[in-house]
Regions:
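Acidic catalytic loop of the alpha/beta-hydrolase fold
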Residues: 206-210, 248-249
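Active-site loop/oxyanion-hole signature of alpha/beta-hydrolase fold enzymes
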Residues: 56-97
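Flexible "cap/lid" loop of the alpha/beta hydrolase fold
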Residues: 104-112, 116-158
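Conserved HGGG/HGGXW glycine-rich cap/lid loop of the alpha/beta-hydrolase fold
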Residues: 15-67
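Catalytic histidine-centered segment of alpha/beta-hydrolase-like enzymes
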Residues: 241-255
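Active-site nucleophile elbow and catalytic-triad environment of alpha/beta-hydrolase enzymes
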Residues: 175-191
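Short beta-strand/loop motif that positions the catalytic acidic residue
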Residues: 195, 201-203
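Conserved alpha/beta-hydrolase "acid-adjacent" motif
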Residues: 208-216, 225
């Protein structure tokens, strides 16, 4: 895996958001990690995608290099932060990819700042809270440092986080803030139906979101409404992929993922 060509901090909605950049040319591709994630989660993928375009990975507030401000995490402010990085770096219109929690943040960015997003890729992210399986929503309801920190402190994820976090004591507050975010109700169905840019939805066949919810999301984007015609002329602009043999937690390692994203955003 290569080191980033550039890195820095972008002032965005009151947060100094950490970013890393690889490659040059083409439409920039912006990557947003999942919960408790880091830019390094995308290292292998960024190497693959940056051979002929610029790829920028960011860390949301309270994650990795990016300090928390102490305010509650909210989807809308995460969307503001992503837009702030895009604007600060002068990227113009980008292709935006978000995974899990980063998918929700990326969807909010596309809803709030549609002019900044040429194409949107969402991996393992639903359009409404009730689309998660009931047991996942129950886990969100109980998510907090008291219940999770002892489990996570011995994980490779925590070890990676400790190497880059500016405050080594800030992981428990991150768990609490993330749990609070994931307990908030949301349903963006109406806004999703109004999106003009093409959207690629990618899920695992053993995801934390049932296939029926993925199909519902796709339907809001104009997908699954009719036959595409023998020549594909009635194919919707948006796409849906369900990858076999994968779960919510290992999707970024799916061998098919790089080419699926390249084909959609190329």
């Amino acid at each position: 895996m290569s080191r980033p060509d550039e890195s820095g901090y972008a002032p965005a909605d009151g947060v100094e958001v950490y970013w890393e950049s690889r490659g040059a040319g083409g439409t920039p591709l912006v990557l947003v990690h999942g919960g408790y994630g880091l830019t390094s989660d995308f290292d292998s993928l960024a190497d693959s995608w940056s051979t002929d375009r610029r790829v920028i990975a960011i860390e949301l507030e309270g994650h990795g290099h990016t300090r928390a401000t102490g305010r509650p995490f909210r989807w809308e402010t995460f969307g503001d932060s992503i837009a702030g990085v895009i604007t600060h770096l002068g990227l113009g219109q980008v292709d935006l990819l978000g995974y899990s929690l980063g998918g929700g943040a990326s969807l909010r960015c596309a809803i709030q700042y549609p002019g900044l997003v040429r194409r949107l890729v969402l991996i393992c992210a639903p359009h409404r809270r009730e689309a998660w399986f009931p047991e996942i929503r129950a886990a969100f309801d109980g998510m907090g440092a008291d219940s999770l920190f002892d489990q996570l402190r011995h994980s490779p994820m925590f070890a990676a986080w400790q190497k880059v976090a500016p405050d080594p004591e800030s992981f428990p507050p991150l768990i609490d803030a993330t749990g609070d975010l994931l307990r908030q109700p949301y349903d963006w169905s109406a806004q999703v139906a109004g999106l003009a840019m093409p959207v690629m939805l990618i899920y695992a066949d053993a995801d934390s979101i049932p296939p029926a919810a993925a199909a519902e999301f796709f339907g809001l984007l104009g997908g699954g409404q009719r036959d595409a015609n023998w020549d594909g002329s009635l194919r919707p602009a948006s796409r849906l992929a369900v990858l076999p043999g994968r779960t919510h937690y290992d999707m970024l390692a799916a061998p098919a993922l790089p080419e699926i994203v390249t084909a959609f955003t190329g």
